[in-house]
């Protein structure tokens, strides 16, 4: 990450509790590294790339009725460390309001539930009268709101990722060599053990 390489964390095939713990521990380690560098070695922190953490099923981690996680802190206070949160969710109404307000750029796709549409339109500037428009969006269509620069809903098209990859077949992205699978597996086991310890303490 410190070299600007996009990293994907695949946590499929394990229990929901393990997925939750690993996701929180991984994000916490990376975000707090940026914070520590900012506090203790500012010149080296300036060399770090801006970090965007993309969180799938974000409502599971940002629900106000569940225990607070590192992702709330990232959205609310980590911007000054150049760490941002990209919260992906089909249930926006289950996102903590304070966090939702800090997500300035929103890409809104078709939303069936009236509860979620109401939450979006009531709590997103310049989207007050877009309930029907959100309901009528087709597959791959979205509305873009980006405060404070864009002060109206901009229609946009979302690429179908398999087609995107097909168009770039054979492109050499010159990625840095990956670590050995055995080394990554050992680190995953350590994170898993840390998650078990955290669960016992709670």
Label each region the model flagged.
Residues 32-36, 77-80, 110-114, 131-136, ...:
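Glycine-rich loops and low-complexity Gly/Arg-rich segments
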